[in-house]
């Protein structure tokens, strides 16, 4: 889990002081047991929520799912085995179990760090390179990156922990103790601390600062865009209507089933899918296909249902309309043509940027909470690692124990960060804990055009 041997198994401490009092043992056992239970419960809620709530199945949440898996391993195995070791005062499960525990602990903990790096890089590229990165940001690619993170963690720690004694020809770990053999050298301990904690933290903090600056820049651009619009104007027809250029009229001889010339004019705006934005959980920045320099037309073309030409009586078509369209000049169109009203494309662009900015800020809040929890819980132990490298007896045994357990507490805090910063996680957790989740009793209620909002139709 960390870059050095645990406090009770540190090479700086020959043996864990035995003979803890019964009240002390009871307090440690109850406290650590509750922490383990909270860790397992919280991360199981994350996994179950991802399974039952389709709104949570986004690319960004795939990384949170992987982080929850690592935290679940720590809560299930690492916490309980270390508590047993701490209370007994010696390792009583044999050398094989010791090596397997250390390998599992360090692989899962390093995978947590790798997943935090993935989340940070994912947010950074989503904000700074929205067009090029979003095209490559697929669930399959996210799964590949997560698999590589776990593979790298396994390759870095598991073989060295399990087979180091065979490489050097002997096992130097003292009987009754359990720690990583090759970390008994101070210089190696110092190097692993820098590579496994300080370097990743530096990278993550740098990326978060860049994300923060870019998000603030987006907010200023959005404020300027909204400020340039004229209040109370820019309202247009519904999404089922199209605007044509002034003077663009259909040909009297346009046959049924064909659209007039004004219908074939380039559309000012591309249809926008709110559903896609909802599911992705962060706003994308695909550019609109409209040309902001164009002005909307002064006529509204309303498409009417087609009529079978064979069933129609042979009548002469009116000279100013096609069989399937009706054009009507609008006052707004004349006002826009006369006053140079801003195109509706800017309103749509502002709405998209607003929605995008909200999603980006929500994802940034989740990242900041996870990153802050990681730094606060892992820093004390890793500071002690550096201190013990230069002064073996300067760190008390109790501080080693507290620092090591504090690293484990990070796995308990992470699910709370998801719930505090993400309403979808929070609502799903609440429904699961209250036993009110039943997919068959959920109905779809439209929130926006093209999106659905799931809400319980009745309680169970």
From Swiss-Prot:
What's in the keyword line of the UniProt record? Cell membrane, Disulfide bond, G-protein coupled receptor, Glycoprotein, Membrane, Phosphoprotein, Postsynaptic cell membrane, Receptor, Synapse, Transducer, Transmembrane, Transmembrane helix
Compartments, record wording:
Cell membrane; Postsynaptic cell membrane
Region annotated Disordered, chain positions: 225-256, 274-297, 310-351
One GO BP annotation is: G protein-coupled receptor signaling pathway, coupled to cyclic nucleotide second messenger
A Pfam match is 7tm_1
Locate the Phosphothreonine modifications and list their residues: 230, 428, 455
* Ranges in the topological domain labelled Cytoplasmic: 49-62, 122-142, 210-366, 421-460
Keyword GTP-binding among record annotations: no
- Compositionally skewed regions (Basic residues) per UniProt: 328-343
Sites carrying a glycan are 2, 12
Stretches with biased composition (Low complexity): 238-247
User: Main localisation, per the record?
Assistant: membrane
Topological domains annotated Extracellular: 1-22, 85-95, 165-185, 391-397
Q: Offer an example of a GO molecular function term for this protein.
A: G protein-coupled acetylcholine receptor activity
Cysteine pairs forming cystine bridges in this chain are: 98-178
Q: What is its membrane topology?
A: Multi-pass membrane protein
Cellular component terms (Gene Ontology): dendrite; postsynaptic membrane
Q: Which residues carry this modification: Phosphoserine?
A: 451, 457
List the InterPro entries hit by this protein, alphabetically.
GPCR_Rhodpsn, GPCR_Rhodpsn_7TM, Musac_Ach_M1_rcpt, Musac_Ach_rcpt
**Membrane spanning residue stretches:** 23-48, 63-84, 96-121, 143-164, 186-209, 367-390, 398-420
Its family? Answer: Belongs to the G-protein coupled receptor 1 family. Muscarinic acetylcholine receptor subfamily. CHRM1 sub-subfamily.
Q: How does it assemble?
A: Interacts with GPRASP2. Interacts with TMEM147.
User: What is this protein's function per UniProt?
Assistant: The muscarinic acetylcholine receptor mediates various cellular responses, including inhibition of adenylate cyclase, breakdown of phosphoinositides and modulation of potassium channels through the action of G proteins. Primary transducing effect is Pi turnover.
What protein name is recorded for this chain?
Muscarinic acetylcholine receptor M1
Name the source organism. Answer: Pongo abelii
What gene codes for this chain?
CHRM1
């Amino acid at each position: 889990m960390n870059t050095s041997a645990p406090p009770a198994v540190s090479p700086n401490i020959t043996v864990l002081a035995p003979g803890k009092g019964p009240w002390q043992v009871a307090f440690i056992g109850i406290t650590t047991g509750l922490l383990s239970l909270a860790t397992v419960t919280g991360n199981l809620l994350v996994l179950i929520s991802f399974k039952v709530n389709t709104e949570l199945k986004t690319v960004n949440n795939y990384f949170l799912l992987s982080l929850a898996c690592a935290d679940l391993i720590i809560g299930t195995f690492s916490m309980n085995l270390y508590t047993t070791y701490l209370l007994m005062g010696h390792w009583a499960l044999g050398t094989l179990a010791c090596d397997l525990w250390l390998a599992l602990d360090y692989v899962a903990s390093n995978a947590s760090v790798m997943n935090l790096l993935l989340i940070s890089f994912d947010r950074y590229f989503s904000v700074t390179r929205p067009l090029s990165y979003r095209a490559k940001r697929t669930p399959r690619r996210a799964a590949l990156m997560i698999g590589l993170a776990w593979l790298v963690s396994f390759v870095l720690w598991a073989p060295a922990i399990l087979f180091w004694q065979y490489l050097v020809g002997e096992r130097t770990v003292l009987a009754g103790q359990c720690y990583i053999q090759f970390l008994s050298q101070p210089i190696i301990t110092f190097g692993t601390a820098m590579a496994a904690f300080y370097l990743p933290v530096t990278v993550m903090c740098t990326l978060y600062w860049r994300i923060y600056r870019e998000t603030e820049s987006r907010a200023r651009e959005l404020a300027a865009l909204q400020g340039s619009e004229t209040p109370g104007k820019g309202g247009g027809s519904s999404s089922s209507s199209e605007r044509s250029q002034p003077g663009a009229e259909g040909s009297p001889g346009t046959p049924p089933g064909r659209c007039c010339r004004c219908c074939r004019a380039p559309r000012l705006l591309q249809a926008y899918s709110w559903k896609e934005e909802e599911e992705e959980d962060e706003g994308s920045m695909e550019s609109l296909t409209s040309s902001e320099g164009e002005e909307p037309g002064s006529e509204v073309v309303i498409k009417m249902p087609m009529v079978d030409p064979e069933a129609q009586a042979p009548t002469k078509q009116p000279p100013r309309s096609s069989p399937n369209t009706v054009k009507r000049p609008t006052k707004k169109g004349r006002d826009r043509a006369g006053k140079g009203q801003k195109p509706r494309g800017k309103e749509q662009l502002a709405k998209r940027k607003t929605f995008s900015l909200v999603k980006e800020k929500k994802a940034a809040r989740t990242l900041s909470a996870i990153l802050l929890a990681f730094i606060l819980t892992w820093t004390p132990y890793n500071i002690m690692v550096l201190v013990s490298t230069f002064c073996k007896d300067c760190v008390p045994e109790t501080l080693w124990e507290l620092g090591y357990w504090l690293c484990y507490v990070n796995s308990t805090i992470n699910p709370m960060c998801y719930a505090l910063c993400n309403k979808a996680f929070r609502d799903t957790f609440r429904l699961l804990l209250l036993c009110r989740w039943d997919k068959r009793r959920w109905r779809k209620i439209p929130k926006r055009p093209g999106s659905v909002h799931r809400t319980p139709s009745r309680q169970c």
